[in-house]
């Protein structure tokens, strides 16, 4: 004879501590590195290729639509930087060259 189960097993509750950090520079701190600033202003496509290569991907990756969003999200995840893919999209959509400069400065600082 089987008895009905009156109590379900309880899951273990744990708290994940995240070692999240912030970007080393703000999106609009473009003038911190004048070389990156000038490249982002006048030839952002070349800066995007350099950022992609510095991140460890193919330098031609930015030629694919949406790939620079994946690179930005990858930088955030690799270095545990707070944010979300939605914030990345908004930043790249409305402040694209400045966001590229921020990514370049971040990789320069961390590498």
Swiss-Prot record:
Report TM segments: none
InterPro entries documented for this protein: PLAC_motif_containing
Judging by the UniProt lineage, the source's domain of life is Eukaryota
Q: Which PANTHER family match?
A: DUF614 FAMILY PROTEIN-RELATED
Q: Which family does it belong to?
A: Belongs to the cornifelin family.
User: Which protein is depicted?
Assistant: Cornifelin homolog A
Recorded source organism is Xenopus laevis (African clawed frog)
